[in-house]
Amino acid sequence: IGKTTVIRQFCQKFYSIPIYDVNMGITDVQRLVLCIQAPVKANVKELYINILEHFFVPFRPTDPESKLRHQALHLMRKFSTKMLIIDEIHNILSGTARQQLEVMNTLKYLSNELQLNIVGVGTKEAALVLHTDAQLASRFGVIDLPKWNLDEDFLRLLLSYKKLLPLKY
């Protein structure tokens, strides 16, 4: 099982949680966990587009970055998103140092503004982007995960993560 498979399974479990009212049925839907793929290269506008695509709402990719940011923030608040998982986070390294910093500052902004937990999943090289800024390095920890087999140890790992995460369903 690879990194992407593990996060997809996790995200499917928490992707959409209906809120029920005894008299009215489903009254709302929460998207506590949002899983996206990092843009192919470091680009803030593409990051917002990747977020918006997961809410299945109309938007114009040609809109200014500020409008896309506003839409993404609005939807993440509306759907009570608590965690943003970004697969292939090492793609950020494909941009210039300035572009990398802009994307990382955007992630920091999203984390602060929405009190959002951000999880980046990628290769070992992805950790390099954190070392460009002392504040980023202190904010985002790096955990190396060994290759796992689908056995009891792996299931225990998943259960321990489930207990640590502040998710309710």
Per-region residue spans from a language model:
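Intrinsically disordered, low-complexity segments enriched in Gly and acidic/Ser/Thr residues
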Residues: 159-169
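Mid-core helix/loop region of P-loop NTP-binding domains shared across ATPases and GTPases
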Residues: 28-30, 42-50, 58-117, 150-153, ...
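A short helix-turn-beta junction within AAA+ P-loop NTPase domains corresponding to the substrate/partner-engaging
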Residues: 131-147
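Post-Walker A helix-loop "phosphate-sensing" segment adjacent to the P-loop in P-loop NTPases
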Residues: 13-24, 57-58
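Charged interaction scaffolds used for protein-protein
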Residues: 125, 148-151
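Conserved lysine of the Walker
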Residues: 3
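Sensor-1/coupling segment of RecA-like P-loop NTPase cores
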Residues: 110-132
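Hydrophobic positions on the alpha1 helix immediately C-terminal to the Walker A/P-loop
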Residues: 6-10
